Design a protein with these regions (language model features):
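Short beta-strand edge/turn micro-motifs at domain boundaries
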Residues: 24-34, 154-186
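Amphipathic, hydrophobic N-terminal targeting peptides for secretion and organelle import
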Residues: 1-37
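Short, charged low-complexity linear motifs
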Residues: 2-3, 81-86, 158
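A mature extracytoplasmic/lumenal domain signature
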Residues: 100, 135, 144-148, 161, ...
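Core segments of small alpha/beta cavity-forming domains
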Residues: 34-115
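Short low-complexity stretches enriched in small and charged residues
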Residues: 12-18, 39-40, 93-100, 115-120, ...
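Surface-exposed, charged secondary-structure patches
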Residues: 104-150
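Hydrophobic core residues within well-ordered beta-strands of beta-rich domains
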Residues: 55, 140, 157-159
Length: 186
């Protein structure tokens, strides 16, 4: 009987130790981030996307978070700051942060009010990126395609982004032109 009691106490103590240790280990190893968390965790000052295509891929990731994910107002502002770090000084001057935030919030509200979802984004292949010199500065043209669902209607939209290399050698978004695609009912 004493041996059985000692074994039971040992099992209880061992189980308690296991639960205590496991919880701490899980918290320490819990590096899974939400999509919003991934966007906010990227340090663009240390790890700026190296190519025009990668800049647009990260920008598209931000767009998907804007339109598809749940987040707090503070996180929206931080995501907007990340997006603005990808923009050329000329574009930033034309869109001061307060104005940018007002337009962004209105656009997101419209998107959600119409129950739209940004289903997928696709950036053109590297070989499809066009490089040109404009006014003595290196520019790149990158096309990104957006697949959007609104109810039972799907639409494809393409945007052609113009990026310009800054004095640090980083590609920054100077502007874009949207081209509407066809819609289909399913």
């Amino acid at each position: 009987m004493i041996v059985l009691s000692i074994v039971c106490i040992g099992i209880i103590v061992g189980y308690y130790y296991y639960l205590t240790y496991r919880d701490k280990k899980d918290i320490e190893n819990s590096t899974e981030l939400t999509k919003v968390g991934e966007v906010l965790a990227k340090d663009l000052e240390k790890d700026y996307p190296p190519t025009p295509r990668e800049v647009i891929k990260f920008y598209d990731k931000i767009l998907k978070c804007y339109y598809n994910e749940e987040y707090e107002q503070e996180e929206l502002e931080e995501m907007a700051d990340q997006a603005r770090l990808l923009m050329d000084e000329e574009l930033l001057k034309k869109n001061p942060k307060d104005q940018y935030m007002l337009m962004l919030e209105a656009d997101i509200k419209n998107y959600k009010d119409n129950e739209r979802k940004l289903v997928d984004t696709t950036v053109c292949d590297s070989k499809e990126v066009e490089y040109k010199k404009v006014d003595g500065r290196e520019c790149a043209y990158v096309v990104s395609r957006y697949f959007v669902r609104e109810g039972n209607t799907y639409s494809n939209t393409s945007q052609k982004y113009v990026l310009r290399k800054d004095e640090d050698g980083n590609w920054k978004i100077l502007g874009f032109k949207m081209v509407e695609g066809e819609s289909s009912d399913d």
